[in-house]
Amino acid sequence: SMRALKYLLDTKELGDPVLATIEMRAIPHWQEFLKQYDKLEIFGMGIHHVDSFRFLFGDPAEITCVCRTDPRSKFPHVDGITQYTFKYENDFMATSLDDVWAWPEDPCEKDIYIRWRVEGTEGMAEGTIGWPMYPDRCPSTIRFTSKRHPAWVAPQWDTVWFPDAFEGTMSGLLRAVEQGTEPEISARDNVRTIACVEACYRSIREKRTVALKELLLPTD
């Protein structure tokens, strides 16, 4: 759904973006190596949302992040439940709420999801990210409405992140290695995603809004 959304943004179907949100109510499986660090959610899960914001909208000017610990994660950590907002030079905002608590456990019913929404001057789009249903096969979704196409348009597909990413993003990386070319999403660009993640942690630690340029070298 992120690639479909990127197409809508690039073709100006939604006009100029005004606000983007991601709302995650899902419980990740924390890999053992993450338990060795005090940094948890943004490095282990939120980084995917940070990367999505950068893929869709580019680098933010400023980042503000707040967090609390996750009651379910019994090991020491700083960030369990997080909320971070990216502010751009043109006043656009993108914000994500990453709620990894999400469920008070049995016997309560579950309501697990990841929803996203982008509002623009000419239209809006919304959808879901399907991975929380894994191992059940649950494709991500998108639908949009715009001044050019007022009725909801909702394309569908049956592919999911795993294993179908091996035919998409991952195959692009493998082709680049084989051909000696720059991949569509490069490691050089990913360094800037890490800078955004570190800006989130600096915002938490220093309790302030952090300019991304504080984390980048002048040549970056």
Residue ranges of each PLM-predicted region?
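Predominantly a Rossmann-like dinucleotide-binding segment in NAD(P)-dependent oxidoreductases
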Residues: S1-P76, K207
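Short, hydrophobic secondary-structure boundary micro-motifs
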Residues: P17, I63-C65, T128, E184-S186, ...
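Active-site rim elements
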Residues: D38-L40, W157-V160, Q179-P183, A187
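Contiguous beta-strand/loop segments that form the cofactor/metal-binding neighborhood of enzyme cores
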Residues: G44, H48-Y134, E167-Q179, L217-D220
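C-terminal helix-rich "cap/oligomerization" subdomain common to oxidoreductases
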Residues: E89, R137-C138, G172-D220
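Short, mixed charged/polar active-site loops
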Residues: D91-M93, M124, W152-W157, E182, ...
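Short polybasic amphipathic segments
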Residues: W116, P132-A151
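Active-site loop of classical SDR/Rossmann-like NAD(P)-dependent oxidoreductases
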Residues: D158-M170
